[in-house]
Amino acid sequence: MEDGVQAMRDYLAGLDIASPEHQVLMNVTAKSEVAPSIIKENLSLHLTHTVKWTESLDTFLNMPTPVAFLEISNKPYLGNMLNDFAGVDQQRVMHCRKAFSDAKVFK
């Protein structure tokens, strides 16, 4: 996958990425990022770096406002793993297929 890092950098360099309106935690740092250039670099490094899943969840769960989790994947998997973390409200966890079929929005 190391060869893919530069290819991903090159691909992302051609995309215009705006600063996110909401917090987005990066898999490689478990921290929120707003700078498009750093977001692109973190997305590239994701190919070869360990996902900081536990650290990311701890960050989310320690935020002052309740967090909603929307899993965007082929099949529901990660949302079920949230059961391992104290403080996760399962009513605020949804897979994208269910969200689209229900046309439900977290409030």
Curated annotation (Swiss-Prot):
GO terms (molecular function) for this protein are:
transferase activity
Out of the domains of life, which is the source? Bacteria
The record's listing under SUPFAM superfamilies reads: FabD/lysophospholipase-like
What's this protein's name? Answer: Putative uncharacterized protein YmdE
